[in-house]
Amino acid sequence: MLNTFAAVVRRWHTDNLCHWKENHTGRIMRYLETDFFPLIEETPIAELRVRDIKAVIDSVAARGVVKTAEKIRQWINSICNYATMLEIIDGNPAAPLAGYLKKTDTAHMPTLPREELTGFYRRLLLADTEPQHRIGIMLLMLVFARNKELCGAQWCEFDLKQKQWLIPAERMKRPRAHLVPLADWTMELLAELLIITGHGDFLFPSRTATGGYISENTFGKIINGMGYKGIATSHGFRSLASSSVLNEQGFDENAIERQLAHVEDNKIKAAYNRAEYWPHRVAFMQWYAGYLRGHYEQARTLNGEVTDKAT
């Protein structure tokens, strides 16, 4: 039997199930299947090189999730050690990457300058991509969510009547459920997306992983392909909203921080009110949606678009 990377991963995963919590086991496979398998799933693990592992880690870190990239590096290192122990490979190709990401751990991800918003929307409308992915990038700009939170979103998390999205605790960076108010434009985009993917569980279902969702690299690759590599990242949309626009408009700083799910552990360990500052959050999310839509409409005019839809 050929010892492909995927085969060794599944063997390693099975042998370690007894040592992990259930949610941890699922998270490991989900990350590896979405970020690593598409590139080297069928590659014999003996042919895996440092550059192959580094390329995957770099692509994950480029989304602004350096800690996730480091976790993936650690898992790959463990998998390669496991393969070495079983004498499937002679040495661990992940070993030289120990400490590789430390130098970028505090680096700020590139943020799209607000002066470029109209141009960004113009390129997005012209991009050769699937309609649901175009809508996904537009939603990411509107809801202040982290990339992985939107990529893995399920329709059951949305209360469209109440115009709310409740992200469950297990999908948040910190284990606390997070509530997102949905502006009018956000609702319109979700209505378009519902027609495309509403028949399944996920807003952005995977074409390759049955019952799964798209790779967290998807939106970043589209943005890079639009010519914004090194200029803008999907994670940077959060900074664009909070630092570049909303704070300058005088919106409540605490409300903005809460909407970004920036909560200090020492302040809210005993009780966490996910609806705190809710009226403020609803107001500035609606205002910001209008601000972005203004740039979007300018882009449509420049492109000669005649439809109101993102598709």
Question: Which residues does each PLM region occupy?
Answer:
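Basic/aromatic-enriched alpha-helical hairpins
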Residues: 1-63, 79-82
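Hydrophobic (often cysteine-bearing) scaffold residues that line and stabilize catalytic clefts
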Residues: 5, 9, 21-24, 28, ...
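Basic, Lys/Arg- and aromatic-enriched nucleic-acid-binding interface segment
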Residues: 60-75, 85, 89-152, 161, ...
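C-terminal catalytic core of tyrosine-transesterase DNA break-rejoin enzymes
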Residues: 85, 138, 142-149, 218, ...
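Catalytic-site neighborhood detector that most strongly recognizes the C-terminal catalytic loop/helix
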Residues: 103, 111, 166-175, 187, ...
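Active-site/catalytic core of tyrosine-dependent DNA strand-transfer enzymes
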Residues: 113-118, 162, 181-230, 240-241, ...
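Short hydrophobic short-linear motifs embedded
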Residues: 301-309
